[in-house]
């Protein structure tokens, strides 16, 4: 990785400068030297130094300016800490609207397209949890639940367990992550936001057949992308299940307000399905 710094020299005063020189060094090592010669009063020069960044370390940049008729050397110092690596911002989103939302197929279609898209498929993790009442998610705060709708509405999504939701509109019937109005575009903006930790999570199911119970064993490896002096890192595990209300139901019904609509690509097939669509499992 490289870093650019620009020095601008303005000559002011009654006389110009003789044999002006600008030196650029990084971490005490010479990178560039410019012989500017004689500079007249009012003259301006801008010079850019390009330096390699040492990953994981503090890099100190120094500009030193001298001239024969200048009494002292003028120095400008700056520093930057280079990332040891550039981690991928992985995005977890939860679709949290209530059961039988007739516009949910827009969200389902968008999720499916994003999971097929090379720019999203390795860093986008959607969960369709369909919750609309307190108590279904022990990790959620009262504020989190207070933002949920009381009845079936257009599908809502909570990115990264925030208390401000996002959602889908008619524009999302055409998958286009370059369109600033779409859900996919907004999620792409989130993924592009720098992150400074890389977390690898591994887990396995442990089933106890004798009493029909299941537990999960998880481990996490955390790597900071830059030195965090005295920082204490805490990792929280959130176990989610793609729950579409099948427990205790003979079948699950998906209302489908898009049935029979004229949409490019048939919204992945949803426009060709009836309203309601019965016995549907969506994961």
State what each model feature region is.
Residues 2, 44, 56-60:
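Extracellular Ig-like/FN3 beta-sandwich strand-entry sites
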Residues 2-6, 213-215:
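Short coil/turn motif common to extracellular beta-sandwich-like domains
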Residues 9-14, 222-226:
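Asparagine-centered strand-capping/turn motif at beta-strand->loop junctions
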Residues 25-55:
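Intrinsically disordered, low-complexity Pro/Gly/Ser/Thr-rich segments with frequent PxxP/GP/PP motifs
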Residues 55-85:
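Terminal connector regions
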Residues 85-129:
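Local sequence-structure signature of Cys/Sec-based thiol-disulfide redox active-site neighborhoods
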């Amino acid at each position: 990785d490289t870093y650019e710094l620009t020095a601008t020299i303005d000559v002011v005063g009654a006389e110009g400068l003789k044999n002006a020189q600008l030196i650029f060094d990084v971490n005490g090592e010479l990178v560039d030297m410019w012989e500017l010669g004689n500079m007249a009063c009012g003259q301006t020069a801008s010079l850019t130094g390009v330096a390699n960044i040492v990953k994981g370390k503090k890099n100190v940049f120094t500009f030193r300016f001298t001239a024969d008729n200048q009494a002292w050397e003028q120095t400008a110092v700056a520093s930057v800490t280079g990332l040891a690596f550039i981690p991928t911002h992985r995005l977890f989103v939860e679709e949290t609207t209530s059961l039988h939302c007739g516009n949910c197929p827009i969200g389902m279609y968008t999720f499916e397209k994003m999971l097929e898209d090379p720019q999203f498929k390795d860093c986008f993790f959607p969960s369709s949890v369909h919750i609309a009442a307190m108590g279904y998610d022990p990790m959620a705060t009262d504020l989190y639940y207070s933002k949920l709708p009381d009845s079936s509405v257009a599908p809502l999504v909570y990115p990264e367990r925030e208390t401000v939701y996002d959602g889908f509109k008619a524009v999302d019937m055409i998958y286009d992550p370059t369109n600033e109005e779409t859900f996919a575009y907004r999620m792409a903006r989130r993924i592009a936001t720098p992150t400074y930790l890389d977390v690898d999570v591994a887990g396995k199911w442990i089933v106890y057949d004798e009493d029909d119970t299941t537990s999960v064993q998880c481990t996490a490896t955390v790597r900071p992308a830059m030195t965090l002096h005295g920082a204490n890192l805490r990792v929280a595990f959130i176990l989610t299940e793609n729950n579409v209300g099948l427990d205790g139901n003979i079948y699950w019904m998906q209302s489908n307000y898009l049935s029979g609509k004229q949409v490019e690509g048939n919204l992945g097939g949803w426009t060709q399905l009836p309203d309601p669509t019965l016995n549907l499992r969506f994961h």
